[in-house]
């Protein structure tokens, strides 16, 4: 199973609007259909600049999924964790659609379209 550093790196690529769409879609359970949601999240987080930092923590293999927390730190407000998970699709770990929606709604405050 992937470790926290690997999942953080994967999520950073997913949220990198400058990265190729195909590469980003490959790390999302929703594939290309989930990329617009990733764009919504990335564009909102980018408006905060360096104010918001985040990382994936405590991944635990749970059958065919990896449960983890996304820890989001904002100055003054502190750190809040959100439960997310990756699913095994074709031998690759991909961010689940429900987790993309958790990040969209609860972290970025934007629409989720998957």
How does the language model describe each region?
Residues 81-113:
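Short beta-strand edge/turn micro-motifs at domain boundaries
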